[in-house]
Amino acid sequence: MEEKFNNATPQRPAGSRALDGQMVPVDLPNFIKEIKNETSYHENGKNAITVFKSEHTTLTLVALKKGEKIQSGTEEGHLLMNLYVIEGDLSFSAKEKEQYLSVGQLLNYHYDYPFQAIAHAECVCLLTVIK
């Protein structure tokens, strides 16, 4: 298996890290601190970092301030998505259905319709998308 790495960027000069490989450890508490301390979180109310990415699976750590949201994009071909709440709470809605999620709860969603998730308080979640 070929390992894949993310290169450092001006926003994350120490950001070189493995994204895919036989075994990829992910230090979630460290990444949470990192994305909450970056300028984009303070200026935009949200920030995210991809912590794993393979051909079929992407894991993204997302931090949201109260009232901020994440929503489906224009991507197609997603089969399943998981949203795990690490801190805070949020509401997830899709096609007239809404589900409240709090710390430690996991939502599995078959990607049939557009969705959005709105934070009720500062929130951190792990978003897994499977294609």
Residue ranges, per PLM feature:
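Conserved short histidine dyad/triad with adjacent acidic residue
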Residues: 43-48, 60-76
